[in-house]
């Protein structure tokens, strides 16, 4: 039973439900510079930083499917975007084995921007929306900065959700 409770999916689903509820209620009226904040997207990118590209993409896809089911979007629309955000965030591990805090911050911001950019691209293919009326030049910087600001908290939360222990380095001579 204890090993079952340590499975990542049993951690991701409740945390994802809480963040989706927060995004739809508390952050629904928070529009800095006319842009709706995407806290679930920030968690997906931060989970990629904490767990690597593959785990970040997996967690982003799961949270994106949950977001689509809860908001009535076509199934997979945000799953693809959030999975891409987690993958891009996880690419930090290709640059450095144990990245500094500022490198993590940059990749969470980059993952959030790429994920937000991919939403209208996917909308073009799956629905009537898409590029019409999108102000991506003003949306992407706000999303990137908000994801970067949330990266300090969400990197640790993403590591916990993915059931990853912090790396410990031991000398080889012991």
What residue spans do the PLM features occupy?
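Terminal, non-globular segments
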Residues: 1-174
